[in-house]
């Protein structure tokens, strides 16, 4: 049975932004001592620094967490090469260790494991990445228990829905950056389309934020937006959406779904004879594994935001090598294609090392103050936090094409906001039909 646009799937409920954050904040609350948030006791004296790492090793976001633990271990080896980080208050260098725990790509589980890292493991610092599904509940726990937290790979506005923040700091792109990158690609072929955009924006923090901000900006730029409404994550029947897009003559499609959900939608588009001239996404088609999983040639010509690549002209503050060298090292060690989260996971350790050196202490307030004062050039670009606790990192546009070394390779086709990141190919238009 097909689903009407915005209809709830039986057995699943549409979660509001308030419900999402409430669920994330109170996950694992039974572990709390008393009903009021309060600082966690200092860790027992130990001869190392401990960083907590909630990570989606499994579940729908597992492709985002795939570079771990390889990249974590590489960064730690560089940090600990000469004995670790000199902590002035300890009067000596301390090695850095991490505790990596699977969140199963679930916000409640993320809140639970984060609270355990704080209350049971007494981590000195938290690092969390990979969409607001991970970042928001982990940040909520760090705020609750006053633990400094470095966040990345979570679009800023979606992350800010869980604020205001005192202890958590995010470096990543903002939604206006991705909107402008997408519009730049669409404007380049605007004379060959009806400028009618269909949105696949689910009922989660990303979907709600993107629907609001994309719609406003696209209408300002003369685009018609066909929004079928919010729908539950996990939706697998898109017949009613496709019928609406056909009726409204949608020729550009955009999505911010988890990869398995978009894969279902995109396959059904082809099965039901709806092939837009362009399809541009973020989260669902970031990963090589996600586009390959579409099957056949369904990835050919898909356009996507690119927040990190071998072509980004930035270097590691830990070891001095560039983005391409990190990608090459990953491929040589694992035999797998580079992915965008690889650089951002690495960069969180660049920030952590810099912060701990400047703090000279494991006092959590001093670590928090050091995060706030960060001004560092990293492998993903410069990071300097503003008063809202975030730092913007560069964003360009890319396109998946048939590759020489890999089944699908990502080319840079748009760089209007960041011309220092060079284009590697021209935009293929329209999407090739099978």
Features from the language model and the residues they span:
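Signal peptide-proximal N-terminal region
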Residues: 71-98, 192
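Extracellular/periplasmic periplasmic-binding protein-like sensory domains
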Residues: 165, 269-346, 410-433
